[in-house]
């Protein structure tokens, strides 16, 4: 039996999962941490805390492994590291961190985002690494001239363990656009970016400071002696384990829900929420509010991403007694449209609706029935409403979804948020029994796939990054998820009609915000492009 380790740096928790080559969980560990808000609207974490958290999560996993009477972990067969995508982590040629880590949550790069989107003819959201980099170029950041290496949080942790400057294709696509045909950074856009930076006297070329992009199934490096001691300071862990290319939380969500093929959509709902649909063909036009990212094997996906999901709910649950399950189930007693109660959960800016700053609030429309059930239902609705607004923008593309799977903390109470999501999307939604393991488990599966592919290549049967005779899709379907159980909920007519009415009220409140905060010139939401269903569900 192999031992495969997956580690994921989430927004509020660092998780570690140990499983075998078929994805069966052997042990788990975790560590809680929080971001800090610095001056200038910058959200950040200390890298020292990331290392401490990784060590603590692994130590807890070791204790869990021993508790299950499986002994000590002397060696691992494969490891995978994942984390929050995007952000800004620059280093000089000596590996010295040049500036504070700027996370995906920062909405301080609007000028760079707009300029690059126009120059590339491709949406560059504010949270993307290249937007952060170019904003620092525009601002004349002192560190810019000394940058020798730019990476993500997962890329940084992977580098500490292996000494390799690499990323998986999906994680790389959150730094700089990736060409699905070449499975590498887009060559034309690289040249365009270099030309823009040359005007500002930047001494480097963008490709030279980006990590190398690798496909799922390729080897991302091996655990060094130094890396083994860093991960397990007790000295019990041997070096030598194979590491998969580090991936983003979006991609590990795809893998954890077995949604990696065309027409399949994964919804991940935790601190943030995103719905990611794998595209059969490129979108016909550019949508500034929609990310185009890539799967671990390079296929394009359209993503509607909202910065805030469960954080606002967490605050209210704490105030109302702390019993998540009871409050979530109480929401089922609320009116399908929440009876005029509306919550806005924005604890940070939300680019989809063109809001740059945080403004959580509760609103009651005239005649509203302000009950706890309606309030909780409104809070859960609002956690997915912004994502739905984004999906509505691409309604004209005629996306056909063959399946929708969901995972994340929002769905821990069975059949509550899952039903609301089905009503919101107008499509059946499945929660797999395995999806509760989360992104760390998804990353472990990618590591297992990399080890499997490497083994087949050694036997002379391989075909490179596509998995040596088994694609990632085949591996997941035939090895990991074969016979997997899940619960599927179909849209409820009353619920779907109620959510549609709630979304109208939600947008009505958003449009009133500029006058509330004294910024009448501010335009939230933009043109009224909302349609009832953002995607078509193919039931054939």
Regions found by a protein language model. Give the residues of each.
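Glycine-rich phosphate-binding loop of ATP-grasp-fold ATP-dependent ligases
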Residues: 99, 171-178
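N-terminal glycine/serine-rich phosphate-binding loop of ATP-dependent small-molecule kinases
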Residues: 1-100, 114-115, 146, 207, ...
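Intrinsically disordered, low-complexity polyampholyte segments enriched for Lys and acidic residues
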Residues: 456-463, 533-538
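Conserved alpha/beta enzyme-core scaffolds, especially Rossmann-like or related mixed alpha/beta domains
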Residues: 168-171, 203-215
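Active-site core segments that coordinate phosphate-bearing ligands/cofactors
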Residues: 5-6, 73, 110-127, 134-167, ...
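Carbohydrate-associated surface elements
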Residues: 106
